[in-house]
């Protein structure tokens, strides 16, 4: 018999210590990776529930196993809340990740070898938008579009490429683009050539849910997202649509199950349901508004200190600091900041002369620092410290001073108070 007082600490101290150390790291480090966030204890409670024991292949009301009456309630709650949150008429909450949600869309809408227009990874796209090392680049004929000299998406080039190559699907969305995407313009281009418009809104889903970034759901045939990042839920994926096309919805459902996955992770779906409910609350909108304010405040300081920001600013939660021309690589900047308990990620920038393993940029995002309570004053102070390190990245004294300042700031703003 399993006893409720069983615990990891006594049974597996090695694992427990790793978990404890990660908990401490999150509290004592400032998290600036744009794709990371802190989920609520309510979400973690759902994920740690006995729902993890239940197999539920199929969809609510159409399962291949018995005993699914309660997990049907859980999944239906998640579906209806996701639809309400984004103004969709269809939602699939089963994808285990954003990448698996994306692969389901490819499977539902395309055949191997079909032409796809996607954002160049080096210009801010994502691996699943056509990178040659990813399934998308291996199975499909990818035509990349990018940004212009100002750092903004070049819609004229996009239209020219679309007319020339006539892709069956166009992809909107990004992993390192700080501007606002014109979803309506993209749909116009897609309609002009008879293509599907598929939008991956993973990075800005929380901003969209709060109404502080344009919603692609009314414009795209299909939209996917992760449920973490700005949405601040559990790690997972969703697929949405407002196309009012039952045939499309059936194809999407079939591409998830049985096409790409077996049993859904019901404990994670419960966590998604909680996160969607939280995102419908008024305070979530205030949080997302602050995310953007903090990002703009950080950009202001970077520019004042003489650092180049790709596109010259930000209209969302992230920014890309361009280090081309400086005697500092993205990899070195990442390591130096990490030594001061500031976590970022090295990132390629447009026309980057260095390899993706070294890079000439760092990507910075504000969802996590905003979640722990930072406002513009803290964001600006932090950016000053970052610039101090980037100015003198090989000086241990500077790194040690900033680390002390970081620890003091983290103590003032605990993640979980």
From Swiss-Prot:
SUPFAM superfamilies: PLP-dependent transferases (SSF53383). (6S)-5,6,7,8-tetrahydrofolate binds at residues 121, 125-127, 355-357. It is found in: Cytoplasm. The modification N6-(pyridoxal phosphate)lysine is found at residue 229. GO terms for molecular function: glycine hydroxymethyltransferase activity; pyridoxal phosphate binding. Its cofactor is pyridoxal 5'-phosphate. The keyword Calcium does not apply. The keyword Ribonucleoprotein does not apply. GO terms for biological process: glycine biosynthetic process from serine; tetrahydrofolate interconversion. The record marks 228 as: Plays an important role in substrate specificity. Keywords: Amino-acid biosynthesis, Cytoplasm, One-carbon metabolism, Pyridoxal phosphate, Transferase. It catalyses: (6R)-5,10-methylene-5,6,7,8-tetrahydrofolate + glycine + H2O = (6S)-5,6,7,8-tetrahydrofolate + L-serine. InterPro entries: PyrdxlP-dep_Trfase, PyrdxlP-dep_Trfase_major, PyrdxlP-dep_Trfase_small, Ser_HO-MeTrfase, Ser_HO-MeTrfase-like, Ser_HO-MeTrfase_PLP_BS, SHMT-like_dom. One of its GO terms (cellular component) is cytosol. It comes from the Bacteria. Its EC number is 2.1.2.1. Homodimer. Belongs to the SHMT family. HAMAP family: SHMT (MF_00051). Catalyzes the reversible interconversion of serine and glycine with tetrahydrofolate (THF) serving as the one-carbon carrier. This reaction serves as the major source of one-carbon groups required for the biosynthesis of purines, thymidylate, methionine, and other important biomolecules. Also exhibits THF-independent aldolase activity toward beta-hydroxyamino acids, producing glycine and aldehydes, via a retro-aldol mechanism. This is Serine hydroxymethyltransferase. It comes from Shewanella sp. (strain MR-4). The gene is glyA.
């Amino acid at each position: 018999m399993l006893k409720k007082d069983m615990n990891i600490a006594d049974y597996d101290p090695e694992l427990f210590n790793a978990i404890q150390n990660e908990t401490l790291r999150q509290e004592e480090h400032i998290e600036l990776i744009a794709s990371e966030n802190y989920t609520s204890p309510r979400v973690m409670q759902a994920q740690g529930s006995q729902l993890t024991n239940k197999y539920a292949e199929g969809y609510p009301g159409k399962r291949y196993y018995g005993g699914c009456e309660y997990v049907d309630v859980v999944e239906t709650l998640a579906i209806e809340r996701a639809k309400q949150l984004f103004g969709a008429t269809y939602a699939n909450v089963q994808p285990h990740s954003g990448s698996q949600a994306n692969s389901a869309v490819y499977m539902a809408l395309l055949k191997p070898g079909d032409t796809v227009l996607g954002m160049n990874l080096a210009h801010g796209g994502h691996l699943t938008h056509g990178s040659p090392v990813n399934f998308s680049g291996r199975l499909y004929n990818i035509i990349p579009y990018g940004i212009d000299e100002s750092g903004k998406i070049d819609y004229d080039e996009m239209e020219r490429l679309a007319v020339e190559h006539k892709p069956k699907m166009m992809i909107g969305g990004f992993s390192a683009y700080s501007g606002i995407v014109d979803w309506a313009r993209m749909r116009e281009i897609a309609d002009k050539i008879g293509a599907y418009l598929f939008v991956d809104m993973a990075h800005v889903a929380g901003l969209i849910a709060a109404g502080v970034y344009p919603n692609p759901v009314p414009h795209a045939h299909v939209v996917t997202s992760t449920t973490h990042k700005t949405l601040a839920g559990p790690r997972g994926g969703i697929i949405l649509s407002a196309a009012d096309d039952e045939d499309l919805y059936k194809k999407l459902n079939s591409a998830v199950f049985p096409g790409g996955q077996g049993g859904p992770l019901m404990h994670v779906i419960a966590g998604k349901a909680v996160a969607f409910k939280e995102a419908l609350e008024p305070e979530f909108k205030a949080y997302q508004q602050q995310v953007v304010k903090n990002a703009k405040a950080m950009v202001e300081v970077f520019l004042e200190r003489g650092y180049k920001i790709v596109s010259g600013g930000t209209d969302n939660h992230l920014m890309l600091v361009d280090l081309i021309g400086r005697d500092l690589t993205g990899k070195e900047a990442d390591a130096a900041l990490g030594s001061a308990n500031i976590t970022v990620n090295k990132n390629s920038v447009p026309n980057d002369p260095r390899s993706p393993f070294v890079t000439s940029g760092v990507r910075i995002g504000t969802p996590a620092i905003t979640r722990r309570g930072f406002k513009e004053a803290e964001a600006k102070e932090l950016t000053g410290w970052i610039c101090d390190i980037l100015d003198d990245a090989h000086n241990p004294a500077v790194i040690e001073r900033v680390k002390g300042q970081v620890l003091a700031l983290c103590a003032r703003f605990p993640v979980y108070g």
